Amino acid sequence: GCEWVSWC
């Protein structure tokens, strides 16, 4: 998931 990450 790209909700809590910054390196999607």
UniProtKB/Swiss-Prot annotation:
Subcellular location(s) of the protein: Secreted
UniProt keyword terms in alphabetical order: Amidation, Bromination, Disulfide bond, Ion channel impairing toxin, Secreted, Toxin
Role summary: Its target is unknown, but this toxin may modulate voltage-activated calcium channels (Cav) or calcium-dependent potassium channels (KCa).
Organism ancestry: Eukaryota, Metazoa, Spiralia, Lophotrochozoa, Mollusca
Designated name of the protein: Contryphan Li1044/Li965
6'-bromotryptophan PTM positions: W7
Gene Ontology CC: extracellular region
Keyword Cell membrane: no
